[in-house]
Amino acid sequence: MPLKVVFMGTPDFAVPTLAEIVGSGHEVVAVYTRAPAPAGRGMALRPSPVQALAERFGLPVRTPATLRSEEAVEIFRGHDADVAVVVAYGMILPPAILDAPRLGCLNLHASILPRWRGAAPIQRAVMAGDSETGVAVMRMEPGLDTGPVAMLERVAITPEMTAGELHDRLMPLGADLMNRALGALERGGLTFTPQAAEGIVYAHKITNEEARLDWAEPAQRLHDTIRGLSPFPGAFFMADLGRGPERVKVLRASLADGRAEPGTLLDAHGTVACGEGAIRLLRVQPAGKGPMEAGDFLRGRRLEPGARLA
């Protein structure tokens, strides 16, 4: 018998999972998502990707500012759901919400738990130079991503893969994994295993300070940082482009050979000396501009070999 599902999600990452659930015949009784937010040059209110899809499906959408009020809890209980599916919703679920669905709340998390619990698991895995990550379906508890895991799918992180590319790889895998988990739950065959007590690492939110490239660091670490922060928020350096220091994001780079004072531009191809080794800039985005090839950027800004990048 199809399950009655409350879906809770907000960004692009959650969209394929909602589509899979609808397509598999489960009854989505409500979709919870973050409220429309200002976006674009005109800062007009724009609904979340999940809300846009839910409205195309004709599903009821709720965008509460809080889930902690008595009214919000009663409305949630009124859905009489078998299960809630949570994918990057963006709000903490209080115990009263976690306890409301008959079969609990399932969360799709983008890591091999317990490694990279928290807000930025995809970016942190790439920034750390991990060789693999994955997606996991777990039962939610009051703790941060501490619940027992039902299903796990592993994915290799290739040496040049960016966080954006990994995000796009994990989206359909996660949707399929959650769909299979719901099928097992419907049949009464979904089992859970407690997370290991060892290997717990937290994926804290990315700060602006750690997005700035420190050329004194080893090239491998900088390369991993660039990959992990591409395309958003973007690792960056500062350069004097004729109008004072300006921020330049690095969207793609590769490891290279070279030695000089860290931050020195070594050639016209965009090779920059690091504390150990060097990296070659491949694709950059100056402030207020679109992405461009690093060679075009260097020629246009007249940055010559020997220039220092801060």
From Swiss-Prot:
Q: Where does (6S)-5,6,7,8-tetrahydrofolate bind?
A: S111, I112, L113, P114
**HAMAP family from the entry?**
Formyl_trans
Q: Taxonomy-wise, where does this protein's organism fall, top ranks first?
A: Bacteria, Pseudomonadati, Pseudomonadota, Alphaproteobacteria, Hyphomicrobiales
Identify the PANTHER family for this entry: METHIONYL-TRNA FORMYLTRANSFERASE, METHIONYL-TRNA FORMYLTRANSFERASE, MITOCHONDRIAL
Q: What are the UniProt keywords, alphabetically?
A: Protein biosynthesis, Transferase
Q: What is this protein called?
A: Methionyl-tRNA formyltransferase
Annotated source species: Methylobacterium nodulans (strain LMG 21967 / CNCM I-2342 / ORS 2060)
Its UniProt entry gives the catalysed reaction(s) as:
L-methionyl-tRNA(fMet) + (6R)-10-formyltetrahydrofolate = N-formyl-L-methionyl-tRNA(fMet) + (6S)-5,6,7,8-tetrahydrofolate + H(+)
Query: What gene is this protein a product of?
Result: fmt
The record's similarity note reads: Belongs to the Fmt family.
EC numbers, comma separated: 2.1.2.9
Keyword set includes Ribosomal protein: no
What GO annotations for molecular function exist for this entry? methionyl-tRNA formyltransferase activity
What is known about what this protein does? Attaches a formyl group to the free amino group of methionyl-tRNA(fMet). The formyl group appears to play a dual role in the initiator identity of N-formylmethionyl-tRNA by promoting its recognition by IF2 and preventing the misappropriation of this tRNA by the elongation apparatus.
**Name of the top EC class for this enzyme:** transferase
Transferase found in the keyword field? yes
Question: Per the record, what is one GO cellular component?
Answer: cytosol
Against SUPFAM superfamilies, the record matches this protein to: FMT C-terminal domain-like, Formyltransferase
Query: Which Pfam families does the record cross-reference, listed alphabetically?
Result: Formyl_trans_C, Formyl_trans_N
